Amino acid sequence: MRIALVGKGGSGKTTVSALLIRHLAAGGRPVLAVDADINQHLGGALGLSEEQAAALSPMAAHLPAIKDYLRGENPLISGTEAMVKTTPPGRGSRLLRLEEENAVHSLCATRLPGDMENVRLMVTGGFEEKDLGVSCYHSKIGAAELYLNHLVDGPDEYLVMDMTAGADAFASGLFTRFDLTCLVVEPTRKSVSVYQQYREYAKEYDVTIRVVGNKVTGPDDVAYLREHTGADLVACLSASHYVRAQEQGRDKGFDTLEPANRTALARLQLEVDAVPQDWAKFTRQAVHFHLKNAHAWGDRATGVDLGAQVDPDFVMGPEAFAAQS
C-alpha cells in the first residue's frame, strides 16, 4: 500500500511521515520510506545522524541506471534516452516488488539500523550548488515517479512518501501514484486552505484523500478541523514529548509515544488498509499523464513519439509481475 504525505510547509508532514513509518515498523510491517521533499529531512526524523543522512545515495544521481533497469526488454522503448519520468511499463519492462533485492534497491535503498531494520529509505536528493538558478526540484523526483510506475506492491507492505509542500505535487502525475494521500493539516486558516486547494485539484482524478490534524491542542482545534475538512479528518496528533526528544537527538524509544498519538497512527493505518488497490485505474492514469507530458514537452525534448511507448494491452499489477517471472 502506498501513502503520500503532503501539506503546507511547516505543517509537520515530515514528522508525521516518520511517526507513521515507525508505527508500521513497530508492527513488523515491511516499509519503504521515500523522501521526496526539497528539504530532505526524513532521514534525520528517522534517527539518522547528519553524516549518515548526507551519505545516502540519491535516486536522482542514478537516473540513467534506473531507466536502463526498468526498461528491461520492452520493445516499445527504443532506449533509455527515450524514457521520461512518466514512461509507463509495458510487456518486457522490469517490474519491482517492495521487498525484493534488485538493481534499483541496491543503488538507492538503505536499510535502517536497530528496531527499524524492516525499513528501507530512499531519497530523491536535494538541490546542489550546480542546480541553483537552472533547475526546478521536479527534475529531482522523476526517478521516484518512474519507480512508482513500475512498483507492484501489496497489502501489509507499505511505501510512505514525504512529498513536496503544498500544491507542488501537482506539477506531475506523481499525485496519482498512491492508494491514499494524507493531508497533514494544522488548525489554522492557511493550513486548511492548502487542504482545500489540494482537494480541488485532485477531485477529477479519483484520488483518495484523508486528513490528519497536527499540532492539535484541544477540542476547539478538533472542531475547527472537522468544520473545514469534514469526513476526511480521520485522526489528530497533539504535542508530543517523544517527538521533541527525537528532534533534540534523544531517542527515548517508540514505545514512549503518547497513547493518544499511537491511536491516531493506528487509525491512519486502518484508513490505508481499507482502500482497494485498483490497478486498472492506476494504469489508465499513468497513460493519461504520460500522453499529457508527451504532448506538452516530452516529444520535443526527446525527439521521439512518446505516445508510441504505451502498450494498449498491458495492465499493471500482480498478474503482470507474475507474467514476467
Task: Place the predicted regions along the sequence by residue.
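N-terminal phosphate/diphosphate-binding loop that engages ATP/GTP or pyrophosphate donors
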Residues: 25-115
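Cytosolic-facing regulatory segments adjacent to core modules
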Residues: 94-114, 123-159
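Conserved lysine of the Walker
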Residues: 13
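Conserved beta-strand scaffold positions in the cores of enzyme catalytic domains, especially
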Residues: 33, 119-121, 233-236
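Hydrophobic anchor at the beta1->P-loop junction of P-loop NTPases
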Residues: 5
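Walker A (P-loop) phosphate-binding loop of P-loop NTPases
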Residues: 9-10
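Conserved catalytic-core segment of NTP-binding enzymes
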Residues: 19, 134-253
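C-terminal lobe/tail of nucleotide-utilizing enzymes
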Residues: 201-325
